């Protein structure tokens, strides 16, 4: 199917260019952490432009021409445009959303076929394509001050997770637990209703996300998966549906998230590394992540690790962030269960604030299974939890300062709560 962009309003926009370093010597961004510098290599992308209105409003045609010419910027001009299908990245290309540009996405599931190699809550599968999808790409970016805006009617209906979805979830769990080939794990069959991600960078390197706005998401909003060298800055993310995390960093290394605003229906910044057998098979920890100067306007957790973290999560540092909403459940939350294995270690939050926290400001839970609790345990592997720090944080109100529910078979290791102050308690 030819995926085209249908302009409701259009005007050619000559926005300022963002010129990247050369491929021979990529520019870098460095942030400090307690465990050493985190260095991110930036993408090297030529400045030449490929406006989509020069390619019959077809962003993928513009992307193909851009890649064939050695790379550049695929520009979505000012106006409202409809994508009837996914944007599929090529290496050395940037998607530039010009000032005043709104890129809408259809909500017809057939537009996101054929299936692609993706994930569902930590399990690899073949599913509808993410709306913006990069697989195996190098030097890619989404930049500009425009907006990504998916239509959500179908995806909202799918949030109800009917019996057919629950049955397919159980089947995917069995496939994963028995190491079935990923190519055979097609979850689009029998009305499984597995919603696609909005943005997924899968097995990619040198990724820049800068300055644009997100307005809604079918599922996880921005998913960084099995990738390296990611800078996400100045992104304004709004999505208030089910499972609408702000950014999920999964089995991804060398990541900086800064100066972003998250207004979410689920967690804000989430660190993951695969579910059970898939996490063990891929064996790629999420590592070397710095998050600073971000705001969680609304959402369940400011910094959350898990529960899908079987490949391990380590060397994570959040500082000078704030949770300003009234419906934040926790500031820092580490969650796992007896099926996960893996590790959570060297994770720190410093100099952060929150207005209202509905539950505990800091929590560790080792028995989190959600809807998967009714499914069988194929193998017990306990999680190492050690060197966890929360320091110099102030919460205006919370039910309690901290709650730690460890597993006596593998007790929680070192936890430091230093100068963590709850001004007033709430029921």
Residue ranges and their predicted role:
Residues 71, 83-86, 106-108, 151-155, ...:
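Short glycine/acidic-rich loop motifs that flank beta-strands on beta-rich extracellular proteins
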Residues 4-13, 17-94, 98-203, 208-210, ...:
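Extracellular "leader-to-stem" segments immediately downstream of a signal peptide or signal-anchor
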Residues 309, 327-427:
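Extracellular beta-rich repeat passengers
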Residues 191-193, 201, 224, 249, ...:
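Residue-level marker of regulatory loop/turn positions in helix-turn-helix DNA-binding domains and
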Residues 99-100, 138-147, 205-215, 228-239, ...:
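Right-handed parallel beta-helix
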Residues 227, 252, 274-276, 306-308, ...:
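Active-site beta-loop-alpha junctions enriched in small/polar residues
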Residues 168-176, 277-283, 372-379:
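Intrinsically disordered, low-complexity Ser/Thr- and acidic-rich flexible linkers and loops
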């Amino acid at each position: 199917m030819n995926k085209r962009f249908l302009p409701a309003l259009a005007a050619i926009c000559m926005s300022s260019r963002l010129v990247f370093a050369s491929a021979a010597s990529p520019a870098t961004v460095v942030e400090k952490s307690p465990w050493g510098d985190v260095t991110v290599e930036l993408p090297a992308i030529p400045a030449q432009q490929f406006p989509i209105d020069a390619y019959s409003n077809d962003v993928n045609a513009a992307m193909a021409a851009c890649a064939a010419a050695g790379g550049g910027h695929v520009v979505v001009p000012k106006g409202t445009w409809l994508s009837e299908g996914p944007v599929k990245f090529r290496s050395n290309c940037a998607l530039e959303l010009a000032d005043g540009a709104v890129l809408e996405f259809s909500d017809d599931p057939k537009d996101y076929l054929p299936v692609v190699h993706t994930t569902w809550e930590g399990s690899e599968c073949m599913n509808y394509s993410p709306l913006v999808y990069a697989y195996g790409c190098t030097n890619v970016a989404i930049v500009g001050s425009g907006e990504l805006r998916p239509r959500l009617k179908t995806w909202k209906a799918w949030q109800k997770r009917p019996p057919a979805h629950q049955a397919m979830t159980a089947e995917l769990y069995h496939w994963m637990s028995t190491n079935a080939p990923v190519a055979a794990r097609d979850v689009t069959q029998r009305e499984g209703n597995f919603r696609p991600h909005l943005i997924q960078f899968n097995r990619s390197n040198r990724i820049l996300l800068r300055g644009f706005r997100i307005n809604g998401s079918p599922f996880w909003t921005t998913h960084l998966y099995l990738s390296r060298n990611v800078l996400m800055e100045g992104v304004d993310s709004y999505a208030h549906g089910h499972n609408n995390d702000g950014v999920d960093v999964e089995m991804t290394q060398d990541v900086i998230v800064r100066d972003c605003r998250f207004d979410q229906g689920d967690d804000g910044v989430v660190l993951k590394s695969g579910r059970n057998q898939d996490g063990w098979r891929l064996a790629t920890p999420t590592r070397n992540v710095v998050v600073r100067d971000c705001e969680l306007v609304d959402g369940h957790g400011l910094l959350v690790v898990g529960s899908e973290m079987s490949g391990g999560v380590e060397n994570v540092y959040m500082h000078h962030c704030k949770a300003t909403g009234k419906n934040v459940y926790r500031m820092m939350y580490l969650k796992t269960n007896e099926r996960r294995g893996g590790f959570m270690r060297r994770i720190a939050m410093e100099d952060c604030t929150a207005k209202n926290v509905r539950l505990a400001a800091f929590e560790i839970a080792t028995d989190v299974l959600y809807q998967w609790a009714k499914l069988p345990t194929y193998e017990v592997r306990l999680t190492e939890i050690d060197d966890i720090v929360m320091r110099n944080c102030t919460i205006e109100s919370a039910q309690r300062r901290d709650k730690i529910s460890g597993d006596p078979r593998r007790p929680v290791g070192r936890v430091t709560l230093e100068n963590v102050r709850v001004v007033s308690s709430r029921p």
